[in-house]
UniProtKB/Swiss-Prot annotation:
Record-given protein name: Aspartyl/glutamyl-tRNA(Asn/Gln) amidotransferase subunit B
InterPro entries linked: Asn/Gln-tRNA_amidoTrfase_suB/E (IPR017959), Asn/Gln-tRNA_Trfase_suB/E_cat (IPR006075), Asn/Gln_amidotransferase (IPR018027), Asn/Gln_tRNA_amidoTrase-B-like (IPR003789), GatB (IPR004413), GatB_Yqey_C_2 (IPR023168), Gln-tRNA_amidoTrfase_suB_CS (IPR017958), Gln_synth/guanido_kin_cat_dom (IPR014746)
Species: Aeropyrum pernix (strain ATCC 700893 / DSM 11879 / JCM 9820 / NBRC 100138 / K1)
A Pfam family: GatB_N
Gene: gatB
Catalysis: reaction(s): L-glutamyl-tRNA(Gln) + L-glutamine + ATP + H2O = L-glutaminyl-tRNA(Gln) + L-glutamate + ADP + phosphate + H(+); L-aspartyl-tRNA(Asn) + L-glutamine + ATP + H2O = L-asparaginyl-tRNA(Asn) + L-glutamate + ADP + phosphate + 2 H(+)
Function, as annotated: Allows the formation of correctly charged Asn-tRNA(Asn) or Gln-tRNA(Gln) through the transamidation of misacylated Asp-tRNA(Asn) or Glu-tRNA(Gln) in organisms which lack either or both of asparaginyl-tRNA or glutaminyl-tRNA synthetases. The reaction takes place in the presence of glutamine and ATP through an activated phospho-Asp-tRNA(Asn) or phospho-Glu-tRNA(Gln).
Record-linked PANTHER family: GLUTAMYL-TRNA GLN AMIDOTRANSFERASE SUBUNIT B MITOCHONDRIAL AND PROKARYOTIC PET112-RELATED, GLUTAMYL-TRNA(GLN) AMIDOTRANSFERASE SUBUNIT B, MITOCHONDRIAL
Upper lineage: Archaea, Thermoproteota, Thermoprotei, Desulfurococcales, Desulfurococcaceae
Molecular function via GO: asparaginyl-tRNA synthase (glutamine-hydrolyzing) activity; ATP binding; glutaminyl-tRNA synthase (glutamine-hydrolyzing) activity
Length: 486
């Protein structure tokens, strides 16, 4: 670990919307609020109107349990909701329904350990999870320009009541880079279990708590991307170090990350838990976690990035390629299905995780849309053609993969290049045309052979030709030329 980050403690509060829940947490409004006109995806419950009572939705609770299981946490037998009181324009009831164990609440998770892959060292890191809360998201406030300078605020309540996971880690994270990798892995895990789409705008927000040299912790609120989490933490470490070096004392406070200026700014003094007046929500009785809910959640949590990565790596696939596949869910599903159909794992992994993925990226296609990937049968066919020696990998990579990326639904057999049936004739034509290269080879210049092989490959004009076979025929023919010269 870099010495710059010794004596640093970082803890994260990661808020992730369960965008795939199908409904809001306590009403039937859509959990995917994007695309609605302002204040149209609402009802009396999520607007907090008098007399409207909340009713817990089953699906968000199951997804929250699945997330707890996938992140290595303990799941309680009962979930209890509490009220967190504070005033803000985007909070229509003037309280948020959340979970807080010290006020009689029962979170969906208490305690656990998250293992995440460090893709710099290729080691598994660990961070303890303190708790996972299931709560409702507030509405969204829009400012004219900056939050610090705006003259007014506009509020859209379409988001109000959307189910939100608050994942709180212990201060076990040793550096800004580790924080970014942890969040990336966490979001990928939630995508794997079907809880969320991490690429949606505003689907997650991070509050980072950081302290140095055993001093007071500072909270940086509402960071909206993993890149900005890393930047904000780096800035905050430098800011706090400078205060200490000048003989000052870091104050406990809440700060705002200004992404445009690349710096944190003070918002307010840090509140204590008592300031929020937590107490159990009298409108919501405890929710018992039933056996069928646990079974459904366990099924969702059975496949995580960690299990898939290890499975792919165990097939003899290089770790970099294994992670390239794992980190893109449609690619992982495609690869595993292709292997089930009998694809050679190492060849299929290279096709999916390197060349096809790279081609799609270069074309500007969405890597996370399954429709942009070919069916597993195509990968199985191509990998086995290479494994049998019918085609070289390079010919498939250069002549088939670009066409398959452009038209993933194509019959892959129709994309295969025609095989060269008259290699001997091509070799003879090249030898007759490239007299100087032939003489160079006969004079002992071995590099001339590579040139001649290249000329034979060029003469094939895109048809399938194994360069090793061309080389063997050239060597055999050149040896006869030597004999004739004698």
């Amino acid at each position: 670990m870099n010495d710059r980050y010794t004596n640093v403690k970082i803890g994260l509060e990661i808020h992730v919307q369960l965008s795939n829940a199908g409904s809001k947490l306590f009403c039937g409004c859509d959990s995917e609020y994007r695309g609605y006109k302002p204040n149209t995806n609402v009802c009396p419950v999520c607007l907090g109107l008098p007399g409207a009572l909340p009713v817990p939705s089953r699906r968000p609770i199951v997804l929250a349990i699945a997330a707890s299981m996938a992140l290595g946490c303990r799941v309680p037998g009962t979930v209890v909701f509490t009220r967190k009181h504070y005033f803000y324009p985007d909070l229509p009831k003037n309280y948020q329904i959340t979970q807080f164990e010290k006020a009689g609440g029962a979170p969906v998770c208490m305690g656990g350990v998250l293992e995440y892959l460090n893709t710099d060292s290729w080691r598994w890191e660990r961070a303890r999870i303190r708790r996972i809360n299931l709560e409702e998201d507030p509405g969204k406030t829009y400012y004219e320009g900056s939050i610090l300078t705006s003259r007014y605020a506009l509020v859209d309540y379409n988001r109000s009541g959307v189910p939100l996971l608050e994942i709180v880690t212990e201060p076990d994270i040793p550096s800004p880079r580790h924080a970014r990798m942890l969040i990336d892995y966490l979001l990928l895990t939630l995508e794997y279990i079907g809880a969320t789409n991490p690429r949606l705008e505003g689907v997650f927000r991070v509050d980072a708590n950081i302290s140095i040299e055993g001093g007071e912790r500072v909270e940086v609120k509402n960071i909206g991307s993993t890149q900005d989490v890393e930047k904000a933490l780096k800035f905050e470490i430098s800011r706090q170090r400078l205060i200490v070096e000048r003989g000052g004392k870091v104050e406990r406070e809440t700060r705002h990350w200004d992404a445009e200026r690349g710096m944190t700014k003070p918002l307010r003094l840090k509140e204590e838990e008592a300031d929020y007046l937590y107490f159990p929500d009298p409108d919501l009785p405890p929710v018992e976690i039933t056996e069928d809910m646990l079974a459904e959640a366990e099924k969702l949590a059975s496949k995580t990035p960690g299990t898939i990565y290890r499975e792919i790596e165990s097939m003899g696939v290089r770790r970099e390629i294994a992670w390239s596949i794992t980190s893109t869910l449609p690619a992982a599903r495609l690869f595993l299905e292709a292997v089930k159909l009998g694809a050679d794992p190492r060849i299929a992994a290279r096709l999916v995780g390197v060349d096809l993925k790279g081609e799609l990226k270069e074309m500007g296609k969405d890597l996370y849309s399954p429709n942009n990937w070919p069916p597993p049968q195509s990968i199985a066919i191509l990998s086995n053609l290479v494994a049998r020696g019918d085609y070289t990998y390079d010919s498939i990579k250069g002549l088939v993969v670009p066409k398959l990326a452009a038209n993933p639904g194509s019959d892959v057999k129709s994309l295969l290049p025609e095989k060269v049936k008259d290699i001997e004739r091509l070799v003879e034509e090249v030898l007759n045309r490239e007299k100087r290269a032939v003489q160079d080879y006969l004079a002992g210049k071995k590099k001339a052979l590579n040139y001649l092989v290249g000329q034979v490959m060029r003469a094939a004009k895109g048809r399938a030709l194994d360069p090793r076979q061309a080389r063997e025929i050239l060597l055999r023919r050149l040896s006869t030329v030597k004999e004739e010269d004698r």
